[in-house]
Amino acid sequence: MAIFRDYTNNQIDHDRSIEDRRRHRQLVEKSIKENLGDILSEESIVGESKNKKFKIPIKGIKEYQFVYGKNSKGVASGVGNEKRGEKLGNGNKKLAKGNQGAGNEEGDDIYETEITLEELMDYISEDLNLPNLDQKKYSEIVTETSGKKRGYQTHGIRPRLAKKKTVMSKIARKQGKKRALKELESDEELERFPFREEDLRYYRVKLKPKKDSNAVMLFIMDASGSMDVTKKYLARSYFFVLATFLKRKYNNIAFEFIYHTTVAKRVDEFEFFHKSESGGTYISSGINEALKVIEEKYPPAAWNIYSIYASDGDNWSEDNEKAVAAVKDICEVSNMFGYAELLPSTYTTTMYHKFKKEITNEKFVPVIIKEKKDLWDALKIMLRKELKEE
């Protein structure tokens, strides 16, 4: 027997567009998450503002409709455990793909949506689901954050307006006037009784001190001649995403920027992401400079220290043992030392293999980026390891 529901009192319950909008939002979010790796490896994001927009291709949702069949023998049927969106049967549709000739079926609707760099970082945060920084015993900075409501006051900003208390104040004033008129035996009636400035009450908010962990990120980049334009672009993209993301997620985090050839230099953020160098490669020079920065400014007992180094893995052979010793030293004073090797040469043995063989400290996290699409996977490995709660 058919059951007919009465929607006369609630027109929203049978609004099919609500379900369509929900599915559309899911489709958009799914497409964005699937394209995170492509955006990070292909888009020029270094140095862009938070309002920089990126285009994301999205497959359109088609309306359900009845169509004529193909006069084929038999039809496909399910067994009861199919999932939503799953296609039954192979069909004989011929679509034009690449250089395979012309097809005879309608294609998929593809359109583009735009998201800003700030929204991109939100999706990265959601995808990674990172924990908070490790808590150090003596590494806390006291900051003020929004606290609890502590009573009322007669002045304040509109967002803190206490509506209920304001109405009660108005009613009390109205009742007081009624009593005064009664005592004066006046026949005056109170018809309209508007709010006055004196009725307004605002929440008094006491800022609550909050303790945050100290943390410093040391970004070290090989800027030598063997790092060509593509490698330097990948390294800078790698560091830029890390810096932008961590600045948004954590309140108190310091950054130090170092690049090196045969000698290392401490630079500011702009110079790190935009200046180019050429010359030979002593990996130990960059790592030792980071150790000096730690010794001068960031005592390990009071700071969470995270160091990340990016290079193509080529190093002057006489410096190899010094580089291994320097990495071992920095692992001892850091929460984590990440080594990212970019587009390594296939003709020579790079430092990735030497480091991985000789450094057994669990704080050493090596990743290798053989092509652009590996950038996102390397970022996920580094971030999850770097900020993992102990």
UniProtKB/Swiss-Prot annotation:
Q: Which Pfam families match?
A: DUF444 (PF04285)
Biased composition (Low complexity) is annotated at 89-103
Q: Which residues cross the membrane?
A: none
* Region feature Disordered, mapped onto this chain: 77-108
UniProt xrefs under InterPro entries: Spore_YhbH (IPR014230), UPF0229 (IPR006698), vWFA_dom_sf (IPR036465)
What the record says about family reads: Belongs to the UPF0229 family.
Q: Output this protein's name.
A: UPF0229 protein Cbei_0567
Report the source organism.
Clostridium beijerinckii (strain ATCC 51743 / NCIMB 8052)
